[in-house]
Structure formats: structure tokens, C-alpha cells
Amino acid sequence: MTQYAASAGDAIVDPATHGLDVYAVGGAIRDTLLGLPVQDRDYVVVGATPEAMEARGFRTVGKDFPVFLHPRTQAEYALARTERKTAAGYKGFSVYYAPDVTLEDDLVRRDLTINAMAQRVAEDGALVGPVIDPYGGQADLASRTFRHVSEAFVEDPVRILRVARFAARFAEFHVAPETRALMQRMAEAGEVDALVPERVWQELARGLLEARPSRLFAVLRDCGALVRLLPELDRLWGVPQRADYHPEVDTGVHTMMVVDTAAAMDTPLPVRFAALVHDLGKGTTPADILPRHVGHEARGLPMIEDICRRLRVPTDCRDLAIMVAREHGNIHRSDGFDATALVRLLERCDALRKPERFRQALLACEADARGRLGFEQRDYPQPVRLLRALQAAASIDAGAVAKRYADNPAHIKQAVHVARIEAVAQAGL
């Protein structure tokens, strides 16, 4: 039996929850039924009041609805509640919670049937009794279907992002046609426009970190939400590239192959975001020069900066994305660079001061090179040579050079630059 206690020693009666009607809900039940590790552990308490919870030592943490921290384990327990839409956006709800709210009342407000299941939690922390599944979640798990619980799905635009994120995690699932229709209706009504930027980024970032991030963007694009959230990305579909370099031709298809390749390489979030936006400039290539994309690197930079401002993207993701968009072509071509060109590239990337960020840029470029039809398993030797060049350039003691030019400080920067070139050349690169 699955245990929800903090440790083996918790498999005894818990005085904080003794006598409470407690259920594990949502992702914990879904993942248990799928045979997956349980990541999210949410509890709902039926028939209690805030005062009763506080009297047991629980600490209130919810601002918009009653959520409490267990006095010992710090696990979150929420009172069963219902919600009613009162205004646009994901915060436009009034919440009702009282002892007369049933478990089924609480479950019906949830987004998908596969997240609207529960199981009673015994006083020793074990799950007991049958899975409570009033809305067909187990059947939808079996058919690998994302299906909304009720028409109230349309009241919360975050649910569009959540469905898309779940698609990136559970790539074999599909969106039920009736749920897709609701999502399209929400997008057309502009509901996603009311989302706060931080929440949009939070869901996109979580989706990028899943195994198949391309599925997130496929779902958003299919329902019409992508063009409202990331129009710079949406316009890439249908833009052709040279078939000799890109057998997949379509720039949007290529971009999705790149983010999935970055995911398969188990890269961190900054690399995956850089992979997502590295070719945005191709969406504004003049039609008369297609399928070539001369200057797309520079054209993409202001778009990336605008997205990062708009969605409050973290600095590490923004900085890497800008570097990769600007330099990915040069990194691809670097196998033909001489020592001078190699050092210039390293210095533009600030690789000597931030070598780890440079390594991440190389990962994004490898994902770009391999994210092409027929190139998925091709070797990408550029990082080996560039990292050897970085090691050689880093062997120069800039402080020692500065001392030699103490009387002529204007020449220090150039002298260090020349010394690095000589070191790279002597390394046979």
C-alpha cells in the first residue's frame, strides 16, 4: 500500500489528522495508477473548518483559499471547496469552503478527469479503500485521453497551459475532441490574454523540462493559443528552409525537433529555452530571399528580448538564448576557423569568464545541428575543438600581461587578445 507519511516511523496514528476525513487527490492517484513515481502529493480534508485545522496545529498558508501545513511534516492539506467564475483570468474566482462541501464537489472543479480521482488516507498515512473516480478518470487513463471534467474548464485559462504541459509529459495521450473545442473557444475569446506573465512562463518552463516539449507547443498551436502567447514562435510554421541543410524544410518543424533533441540530451532549462527561440529571426525573412535566411540571427535578437521582458524570463535563460541566437551559425562553422577567429568567437561569447554558460551554448548548438531530419545521430565535433581552444586561451595569465603593460594600459586588452591567439595556435587548433 502506498504510504504518504514522511518516514517509516510515521506509520502510526497521526494526532494532527486523527478523526479527519482526509483524501489523497489529483496527481498522486493518477501517477500511482500509471505505475509512475509520485511527485505531487495533495490532500483534501472534507467536513472540517479552518478553526478546527488550526486547533490541531496546522498553519494557514493559503491566501485565496484555505490551505494548511501539517505541524510536523509540512505537507499541504486543503479544505474541500467549490469555485465560481467572477472575472477574467485565472484569479477571477470566488471560493466557497465549508463542512458541507463534499469530495465530489471538490473533484468536479478540477481540470481533467485523470486529475479528478481520490483515495482515502488512513490515520497511519496509507491509502485505503477503492479509488474514488466519479468522472471517469480511470477509463481516460486507459484510453490515454485528456478530457475535461466539466464545462467549468473554460473558466480558467491556465488549464490550456496545463493540458499542453501534460501532453509534453504524457506524450502518448491525446486531447479529447470536445476538450480541444473548449480550448479553441477559450483562445478565440482571448482568455489567455488575461494570464499573468509569470504563470505563463512557469507552465512553459515546466513543459520544456518534460520528455517531449514539442507536444506542449503542438497542443497550444492546435487550439489557437500559441499565436496569442508566442506569436514570434507561431509564425515559424510554413516558413521554408533550404532542403539540403534542412530536409524537414519547415522552420517550425525544425524548431520542435531541436527542443526535443535538447530534451533527449537531458539539458537544463536555459539550453532548452535557447533551443526553442534560436531561429525566431527566420519568421521575418523577406519572402524574396527564401528559402535562404541571411541575417536571421540578428533579426531574432529583439524578438527574444521582447519575449523575455513580456514573460519575465529568468536572466540565465535570456542571456543564453541571446548568445545562441546570435552565434549558433558561427559555432556551426567553427570547424573551419583559424586561431584568430576562434579567439574572437570565445571572447564574443564571454567564454573565458563564463565557461559553463559557453558549454551550455554548445549543447544548444548540438541540439540544433542534430534536430534535422536524417541528422539525428550525426556527430557534432565542434564542441571538442572549441573547448580545447577555450582551455588554451584560458592558460594566458591576463594579470601577468597587464603588469607588462602597466605603463601603457591602453594596450592591455589587445595584448591579452594576441596572447590568446598565439596560445590557441600553438595548441594546433
UniProtKB/Swiss-Prot annotation:
Gene3D superfamilies in UniProt? Beta Polymerase, domain 2, cca-adding enzyme, domain 2
UniProt xrefs under InterPro entries: CCA_bact (IPR012006), HD/PDEase_dom (IPR003607), HD_domain (IPR006674), NT_sf (IPR043519), PolA_pol_head_dom (IPR002646), PolyA_RNA-bd (IPR032828), tRNA_CCA-adding_enzyme (IPR050124)
Q: What is its EC number?
A: 2.7.7.72, 3.1.3.-, 3.1.4.-
Instruction: Give all cystine bridges in this chain.
Output: none
Protein's GO biological process: RNA repair; tRNA 3'-terminal CCA addition
Q: Which domain of life is it from?
A: Bacteria
**Signal peptide interval:** none
Q: Does the keyword Ribonucleoprotein apply?
A: no
CDD domains, per database record: HDc, NT_ClassII-CCAase
Q: Which reaction does it catalyse?
A: a tRNA precursor + 2 CTP + ATP = a tRNA with a 3' CCA end + 3 diphosphate; a tRNA with a 3' CCA end + 2 CTP + ATP = a tRNA with a 3' CCACCA end + 3 diphosphate
List the Gene Ontology MF annotations in alphabetical order.
Answer: ATP binding; CCA tRNA nucleotidyltransferase activity; cyclic-nucleotide phosphodiesterase activity; magnesium ion binding; phosphatase activity; tRNA binding
Relate the protein's function as given in its record: Catalyzes the addition and repair of the essential 3'-terminal CCA sequence in tRNAs without using a nucleic acid template. Adds these three nucleotides in the order of C, C, and A to the tRNA nucleotide-73, using CTP and ATP as substrates and producing inorganic pyrophosphate. tRNA 3'-terminal CCA addition is required both for tRNA processing and repair. Also involved in tRNA surveillance by mediating tandem CCA addition to generate a CCACCA at the 3' terminus of unstable tRNAs. While stable tRNAs receive only 3'-terminal CCA, unstable tRNAs are marked with CCACCA and rapidly degraded.
Query: What more is known?
Result: A single active site specifically recognizes both ATP and CTP and is responsible for their addition.
Protein name, as recorded: Multifunctional CCA protein
Provenance organism = Ralstonia nicotianae (strain ATCC BAA-1114 / GMI1000) (Ralstonia solanacearum)
